[in-house]
C-alpha cells in the first residue's frame, strides 16, 4: 500500500532502505538516554537517523557532545554503533553556532542565566558577529568543519549533513551578513562560506555523501532571518550541487520564534501537514538530487502521496517519531489506525528544551 514510502533510495553511494528519516533534533538528553532513544527509533525501521547539532568545537553545554575531540568521538561511536546494530544508517549534522561563545560564557559568569535573556543576547549579536568576523576566523572554522567531517568518518557515520542554518545560514542571509568583502553582498559572495565548507569536506572525505540542510526564509509574511530567499534558491542549489552536495534537507530558516520553525497545532500560518513543503517544491525545480521534506508530517497516506507525486524524495520527522517510535513498523504492518499521532503541542519536546525540563512526549 505504501510502496513509494517503503522504496529504497540512493544518496551518493549510500543506499537507504526506505524514504523515512529521523530529523536532527536537540533533546538535552544524557548519553545513555540518547542511545536508548535513537535505538528505539532505529528498531522501528527508519532508514536514516540524523544526529543534530554535532559541534565542530568543544561545547559549554553539559549534555552536548562535540566531535572535535577524542572523548566526544568515543561517545558518538557508542551512539553510531547502537543505531547500526538497530538497523539504521546515521548522519552527523555538523554545526557551528552563530554567536560569540566567549560572550555568552562571560554573560553567564555575570549571573545572567535566564534562557530568554541569553537567547536575546545571542540573537541580537548575530549580525555584528557575522559582519565583523575576521577572515582568519572564517578560515579556521572552515578547517574545523573539514577536521570534524574526517572524525565523523572515523567514528562510523554514513553521511555528513552540513547545518545550513545557524552560522552557515547567517552568512548566506542578506539580513545578517552585511560584509563588504568577498564573503558578503551578492549571492555568489554570501554563498562563499558554505561553498568553501562543502569543498573542504568533499576534498577530505571523498566517499561519504554530503547532505545540506537548506534554510529558506519567507517574506509576506516574514518568517526567519537566516538562510536565503525563495528567489535566491536556484543560485545556491546549483552552486552547492556543482561542489559535491549529494542531497538537500529543506526547511524554514531559523531566527524567528521557535514556534515558527517548530510550529504548534495552532500556528497562524504553518497550520497544515507538510507546512514547509512549498520550500522543498522550489528546490526540486532546480535539481535532480534527492530532496528531503519536513514540517508536521505524520500521515502515511499524505507522505505516500507527496513522494509518488515527486514533490519530495524523502521525508524527515522528529515529533511524530518521538510521539510513536513504532510509527514506521505500524505502517509496514498495516496498523495505521494504531499510530499515536503527534498533536504538535510542543509541551514536553520543544518547550521542555526552553524551560530545561525533562524532554519527552505528553503521549508517553
UniProtKB/Swiss-Prot annotation:
The keyword Transit peptide does not apply. FMN binds at residues 93, 213, 296. Its cofactor is FMN; [4Fe-4S] cluster. It catalyses: urobilinogen + 4 A = (4Z,15Z)-bilirubin IXalpha + 4 AH2; urobilinogen + 2 A = (4Z,15Z)-mesobilirubin IXalpha + 2 AH2. The record marks 255 as: Important for catalytic activity, assists active site Arg in protonation of C4. [4Fe-4S] cluster binds at residues 342, 345, 349, 361. Pfam families: Oxidored_FMN (PF00724). GO terms for molecular function: 4 iron, 4 sulfur cluster binding; FMN binding; metal ion binding; oxidoreductase activity, acting on the CH-CH group of donors. GO terms for biological process: porphyrin-containing compound catabolic process. It comes from the Bacteria. The active site is at residue 166. Gene3D superfamilies: Aldolase class I. Bilirubin reductase that catalyzes reduction of mesobilirubin and/or bilirubin to urobilinogen, a key step during heme degradation. Cooperates with BilS, which is probably involved in electron transfer for BilR. Urobilinogen then spontaneously degrades into urobilin, which gives urine its distinctive yellow color. Belongs to the NADH:flavin oxidoreductase/NADH oxidase family. NCBIfam families: bili_reduct_N. This is Bilirubin reductase. It comes from Clostridioides difficile (strain CD3).
